[in-house]
Amino acid sequence: MNRRLIICVGLLLFTFSSFAQLRDIPKEVEQAFTAQYPNATAVEYRDNLVNVKILFTHKGEKLIASYNNAGKWKETEKAWNFEQLNADIKDGFQKSKYADWKVTETKIVNRPDGVELFRVKVEKNEIQKKHLFFNAAGRLIEDFITL
């Protein structure tokens, strides 16, 4: 019984992963990415139908860039450590209503027009999880529910 279940699950995962790429990556996205990051290496495109996420290495750092289907850059994120955030951001988090939530992930997010935000993923329990976006001064700019 267990063996059959494992085989079925394995076949399902294989089937879903082989059909995950439903279409070719839009040329506009590829061109915009190549223009923005000409020296990127280890490039991996992930098509989400409404946007494309691109995992890559640039100047020794692992990054994720997001573009819409027309090739317009939305943001680039880089993994970061909460303890490395400046004192203003940590203070802003401690003064927020999420201070008692557990920090599970921190990223630096660069957006068009030179906007740099610091995304802190927090969770209170298995159901209540949020992405918090702080500016460099420690002000909470946005918060979104996440999975």
Region spans (language model):
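Mid-chain, structured segments of secreted extracytoplasmic proteins
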Residues: 65-106
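Boundary of Sec targeting at the N-terminus
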Residues: 20-21, 33
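Exposed beta-strand-loop-beta-strand "reactive/processing" segments of non-cytosolic proteins
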Residues: 41-64, 114-132, 146-147
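N-terminal signal peptide c-region/cleavage motif recognized by signal peptidases
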Residues: 15-17
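A short linear hydrophobic-aromatic micro-motif
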Residues: 39-45, 102-107
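Positively charged n-region of N-terminal signal peptides that target proteins for export
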Residues: 1-7
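Short, low-complexity, Pro/Ser/Thr/Gly-rich segments in the mature regions of secreted, periplasmic
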Residues: 135-147
